[in-house]
Amino acid sequence: MGGERQHYYGKHGTPQKYDPTFKGPIYHRGCTDVICCVFLLLAIVGYVAVGIIAWTHGDPRKVIYPTDSRGEFCGQKGTKNANKSYLFYFNIVKCASPLVLLEFQCPTPQICVEKCPNRYLTYLKAHGTQEFEYYKQFCVPGFKQNKAVTEVLRDGDCPAVLIPSKPLVQRCFPAIHAHKGVLMVGNETSYEDGHGFRKNITDLVEGAKKANGILEARHLAMRIFEDYTVSWYWIIIGLVIAMVLSLLFIILLRFLAGIMVWVMIVMVILVLGYGIFHCYMEYSRLRGEAGSDISLVDLGFQTDLRVYLHLRQTWMAFMIILSILEVIIILLLIFLRKRILIAIALIKEASRAVGYVMCSMLYPLVTFLLLCLCIAYWASTAIFLSTSNEAVYKIFSDTDCQAVGKTCNPENFSSSSEFHLCPGAHCQFAFYGGESTYHRALLGLQIFNAFMFFWLANFVLALGQVTLAGAFASYYWALKKPDDLPAFPLFSAFGRALRYHTGSLAFGSLLLAIVQIIRVMLEYLDQRLKAAENKFAKFLMTCLKCCFWCLEKFIKFLNRNAYIMIAIYGTNFCTSARNAFFLLMRNIIRVAVLDKVTDFLFLLGKLLIVGSVGILAFFFFTHRIRIVQDTAPPLNYYWVPILTVIVGSYLIAHGFFSVYGMCVDTLFLCFLEDLERNDGSMERPYFMSPTLKRLLNKTNRKPAES
């Protein structure tokens, strides 16, 4: 038996030996992984340089404002187009050209105007009359009436026809409506194209569809933004409620851990049960209603999610999903009921540790602020990089011409050879790009920007884990609690992490960042290859995505435990990761049962908080609470604030529970070390609490017993 035990330990490393000088986290330690610290500092300097370059060349106005054929912004304050907020297309029918899908521009002149045309008028009719004063505001800036009509229309100085239009996303689109099933614009069922020909309204519809297709995503974003502007304070109230519930839950957990865990389990089951009941009631209510039996497949994707709530199949799907979750949770609770008692003991011990280090509950705010700083820098740099291209002008024409698609200069295009080669062609703004070294490097800079975001974000999370681990390890290794607990354990752990272990944190976060950026690239390639019919390529891509997902999960698990060892012993990252991994492998059964059951209980706590706040938000924003029915704001998509509240509530609950989770993981690792280092004798007493000793049938022997 002893030989087997020796072989087992040899296979998974050597257990920690008794050290009479060890009293918890080592204070006299040296710097670790200095090379990685230097690399991180150099990378940050380079990241700042990239940000400065991007801010120098970038122009976010290119995202906000529409751009005319000369590359000038419509509605931008401080410019000559400050009062011209709308983009007007000379001939929107040409937007039906396939060129729109290739160049993302309609092959027709576009100008900025103060307001969209509100009457039907042709250039031939307006020319030489008083109505031309109204008409010429839709001609190119600086137009002078010294050309023949044919020259004006050929050169694209004025549109051939004005059609009643309405603004949509700062663009002028024909005001098309249906009257008794017939499409009309104004009071007409057809229109004159300005060249003496009558055309059908459907031509306008096709042109408007193609032009509008480019803007649908932006229009959806604008409607979502409108919902945020009228509901942001209610969203904040919902997040505050989630914060209060999380804090209240953790305070109660400190004093009533056992009762709270069982109450939490029962409440989650009841919440899911109510969800099943509500889905069944909605399913029954829709029986017999017109259109409620349409299948989800036949309906297809709809941006207005309220449409799905009028289908019986939707509520049936919800009911099945919730029922499956209910059965899974009940079965897990039945088979893990004995292990739950052990997990409760760990949570109680963690509650005591958090009680002695109460400032640890505020540390997630520090992590949150640092992450917000990383996100803000990454997002602003990405926007400035994406808008740092120069305006590129190309030749557009609705005729077949060799020069179409070539770059041009709008200043001298009328005197160029391409203009004479392609009569009726226009040199207009196409997109933002460039051929300089900087512009060719933009994709690489965007990848570097994303990589640095992952690295710094993971570094911030690692700093928080090491800080909390150091504080809670100080609690565990205090033989007489709380008398032997050092003053300000959280601040001491934070200082040690930054002073000695910045390099180790940079090393661990670098490994994770590399895997994450590879996963992002794989997702990008997967989107690009979706149209391909190569089954082997799809299979290979799926395998790669799965492998790197598993690798990321493993590295996160290994890093977390390595950071605990760094906080305790002050060793470098590789040594800490190896020791933590072998320690866990020597106690793999305890890891699988105790640690993961505790994680499961914390997940149930998050679901309870998120579910409660989510249900409250659903009833509020759908005007189903009669007391505050008139208080809820009118919305385009009520799911926007509901999803925001749900995601925000989860992040808040996760922030609070992450402290508890780190505490449990730290105490668990310290507990395993305690079992290997000590034997309960006077010389080598156990540091674990009396509760854990009773739970594991361990005791510290008294002098007479020794």
Swiss-Prot record:
Swiss-Prot/TrEMBL keywords: Antiport, Cell membrane, Glycoprotein, Membrane, Mitochondrion, Mitochondrion outer membrane, Phosphoprotein, Transmembrane, Transmembrane helix, Transport
Topological category with respect to the lipid bilayer: Multi-pass membrane protein
Cytoplasmic side: 1-33, 254-256, 337-364, 462-504, 585-599, 660-706
Post-translational modification summary for this protein: N-glycosylated.
GO BP annotations listed: choline transport; ethanolamine transport; transmembrane transport
Glycosylation site positions: 187, 200
Topological domains annotated Extracellular: 55-232, 278-315, 386-440, 526-563, 621-638
Catalytic activity entry: choline(out) + n H(+)(in) = choline(in) + n H(+)(out); ethanolamine(out) + n H(+)(in) = ethanolamine(in) + n H(+)(out)
Keyword presence, Glycoprotein: yes
GO MF term set: antiporter activity; choline transmembrane transporter activity; ethanolamine transmembrane transporter activity; transmembrane transporter activity
Family: Belongs to the CTL (choline transporter-like) family.
PANTHER family: CHOLINE TRANSPORTER-LIKE (SLC FAMILY 44) (PTHR12385), CHOLINE TRANSPORTER-LIKE PROTEIN 2 (PTHR12385:SF34)
Protein name (record): Choline transporter-like protein 2
Taxonomic lineage from the root: Eukaryota, Metazoa, Chordata, Craniata, Vertebrata
